[in-house]
């Protein structure tokens, strides 16, 4: 699924998603007038109780059958503005001015901000529905799938009989392209894939025929094929139910595929607004241009990670990474891993040369994190071998030699997995040095401060705490913690998946520079195939615990051998 450019160069055509979701002929924008207006936000201002203003007079209109992309990075105020449509204000904030007016399909007009708590609860899920980023937040793990949708109907007194509600459950399951069988409705959430869970969440949101749908980054973390299915479902359900949808995201590539109109927010202000093709292909504001310039593209034409420096310089100085007659730096041989009777990795073979960056690609449930953790000694229950410079590594990191522990370092998806919120950054980064027991405290501090500079943080960050840092700064500190013992291999587990595109680009640039300067080898675990040419020299594609494609980046992307890889490539959203 890609977004093509019109012959006149003025913008994209949406044939792929438009046609695949039932649109007839060429894409045409929804009608916007007083009759189709559903939600109007005017001069909305929110502030902290100390008086700091967070939203500075935001105006948003939503119309029936339209999807509006509300775009911005962390701290832009996009989620705060979107949640106001639900009558929700985050703890510590208060509305100081403005109105939120809902025009229901039954002809009623509602002042959302004047509703009582009971009235707001009644409105949510019936007139205004919400789909969170993580389906686990909308699905009760202790309730069967069908019962959860039925509960929404029961709470809002849908229909006149139990049989009518039961039929509505089956109808909405069919609408989101999931089975409506008794067996499927009786499943538990953990028995569904991430994409299936998200589609159940969409079914719950549409069960009561809402007027407005608020979607808060609902495809973050999904592989591109699953993301494509979810986006099609959102588009289909919006068109079929004549709903006004607000899609909150930092992913402009997804916006280009899905929405009719784009609103860009920066620090509590709307800085640009217009039809999707005008904003994405002829942006007026510098911030919009910055966001667009940071989107990773499969072709690698945008140099978001500084890879030209790697290609031209590292090989000249250190020698290009290439298959060696000797043992590779890191080698995985016939690795298998099972949880009880469930085998999640099937005979994995993988090799990483010195200075090489391998992108390990897979969807949720593919086994990629299990493999990464096994390599790092964090999943000791595997069979098979992991070797470093030809020497077999103990299965558990605790049983590995000090040199082996120092040589292979793991960076978690969440920086808080390695940064203790009660410790300063310097104290957390010092832990590997303390455990090694080879340096004085003064020497440890010197190394930590030098490493802070290496990850482009000031030495003053030594005395700051994780909660005081932005998401990108915390991830840099987590990378620094992995670097203090001068490893040869960094295992990076989805470390940019939760970051804004510009912050992601800065982390990719940092990793490229570290490889250039230190000759590091990387195993970069991700579900995002568009990052391949920006971070990797090789790609290994993992599907259901089996590596189905493996080779140099250009070979895998230009000539994929497996249908799964071809499917991923066909479904990449792009601009």
Cite the ranges covered by each PLM segment.
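Conserved ABC ATPase signature
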Residues: 188-192, 196, 465-469, 473
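ABC ATPase "signature
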Residues: 273-274, 550-551
């Amino acid at each position: 699924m890609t977004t093509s450019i019109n012959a006149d160069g003025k913008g994209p055509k949406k044939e792929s998603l438009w046609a695949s979701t039932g649109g007839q002929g060429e894409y045409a924008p929804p009608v916007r007038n007083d009759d189709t207006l559903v939600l109007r936000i005017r001069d909305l201002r929110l502030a902290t109780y100390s008086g700091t203003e967070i939203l500075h007079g935001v105006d948003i209109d939503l119309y029936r059958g339209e999807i509006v992309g509300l775009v911005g990075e962390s701290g832009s105020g996009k989620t705060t503005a979107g949640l106001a449509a639900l009558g929700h204000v985050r703890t510590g904030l208060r509305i100081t001015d403005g109105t939120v007016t809902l025009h229901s399909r039954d002809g009623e007009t509602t002042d959302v901000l004047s509703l009582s708590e009971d009235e707001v609860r009644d409105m949510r899920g019936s007139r205004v529905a919400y789909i969170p980023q993580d389906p686990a937040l909308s699905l009760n793990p202790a309730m069967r799938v069908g019962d959860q949708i039925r509960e929404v109907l029961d709470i809002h007194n849908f229909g006149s009989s139990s049989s009518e509600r039961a039929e509505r459950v089956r109808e909405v399951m069919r609408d989101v392209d999931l089975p409506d069988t008794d067996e499927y409705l009786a499943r538990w959430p953990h028995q569904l894939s991430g994409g299936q869970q998200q589609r159940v969440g969409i079914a719950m949101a549409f069960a009561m025929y809402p007027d407005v749908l608020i979607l808060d980054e609902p495809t973050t973390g999904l592989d591109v094929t699953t993301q494509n299915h979810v986006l099609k479902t959102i588009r289909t359900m919006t068109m079929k139910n004549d709903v006004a949808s607000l899609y909150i995201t930092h992913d402009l590539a997804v916006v280009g595929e899905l929405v009719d109109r784009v609103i860009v927010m920066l620090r509590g202000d709307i800085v640009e607004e217009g039809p999707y093709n005008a904003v994405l292909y002829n942006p007026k504001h510098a911030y919009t241009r910055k966001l667009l310039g940071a989107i990773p593209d499969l072709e690698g034409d945008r140099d978001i990670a500084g890879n030209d420096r790697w290609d031209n310089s590292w090989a000249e100085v250190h020698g290009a990474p290439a298959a060696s007659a000797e043992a590779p730096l890191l080698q995985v041989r016939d690795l298998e891993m099972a949880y009880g009777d469930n085998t999640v990795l099937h005979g994995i073979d993988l090799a990483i040369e010195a200075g090489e960056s391998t992108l390990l690609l897979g969807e949720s449930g593919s086994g990629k994190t299990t493999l990464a953790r096994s390599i790092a000694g964090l999943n000791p229950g595997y069979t098979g071998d992991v070797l470093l410079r030809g020497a077999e590594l103990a299965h558990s990191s605790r049983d590995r030699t000090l040199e082996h522990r120092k040589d292979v370092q793991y960076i978690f998806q969440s920086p808080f997995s390695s940064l203790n919120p009660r410790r300063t950054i310097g104290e957390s980064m010092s832990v590997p040095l303390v455990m090694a027991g080879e340096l004085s405290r003064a020497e440890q501090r010197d190394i930590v401060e030098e490493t802070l500079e290496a990850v482009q943080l000031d030495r003053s960050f030594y005395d700051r705490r994780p909660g005081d840092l932005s998401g990108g700064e915390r991830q840099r500190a987590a990378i620094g913690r992995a670097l203090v013992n001068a490893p040869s291999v960094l295992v990076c587990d989805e470390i940019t998946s939760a970051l804004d595109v510009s912050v992601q680009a800065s982390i990719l640039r940092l990793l490229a520079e570290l490889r250039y300067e230190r000759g590091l080898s990387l195993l970069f675990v991700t579900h995002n195939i568009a990052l391949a040419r920006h971070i990797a020299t090789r790609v290994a594609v993992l599907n259901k615990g089996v590596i189905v494609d493996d080779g140099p980046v250009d070979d895998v992307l230009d000539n994929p051998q497996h249908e799964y890889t071809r499917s991923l490539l066909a479904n990449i959203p792009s601009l």
